[in-house]
């Protein structure tokens, strides 16, 4: 195994360009190349990987991504060629996308991020995030088996997706509390962004009793900046009011390719 990000890899060095979305195959195949290489890309199954030359670029291409898109690629190219490849893909129709946009897609897809829905201040494991089926307890060499089972026997919460009911409200941040209709804290926001319709959409770690779809909760957005108790504030002072949220299905309906 080699670290292809390390300069010691020399000509084999690689950096990653993510090309995601319904038009990504069409854009990728606009690059000049042999029919065999294009066929390898066009026939790539999910999580498949191939090594081809397209547009004169030596590429390792995987059918992967972290945006929830069914059509998605990651292009591993030498760092000296990355900028040229990026600009050529844009000229062929790709739209540049920053990390915030990518994160909004991740959250909408219900995918966990290390430090938010995995590990982080709440010490969450794969099952907390809804990915417990990836933990292979049948493997005899899994040294964390006992600890995982013990944790699962005690776990009372799980990650959910939620959406604020109104637009134009203060965005929740990691660590903001979720409360039930009686004002009891039942969860903690782990991630939040804005969806394609202008609503704040996020993920939170909540008590299992409140994880059911369409459950109504409220979030104290910006709780770290909350003002004093309203009974202790003078006229004209402001304090944070909770915004109502709706719990969504753990993952969105799977889109066809």
Locate each region found by the language model:
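Conserved, structured C-terminal
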Residues: 1-257
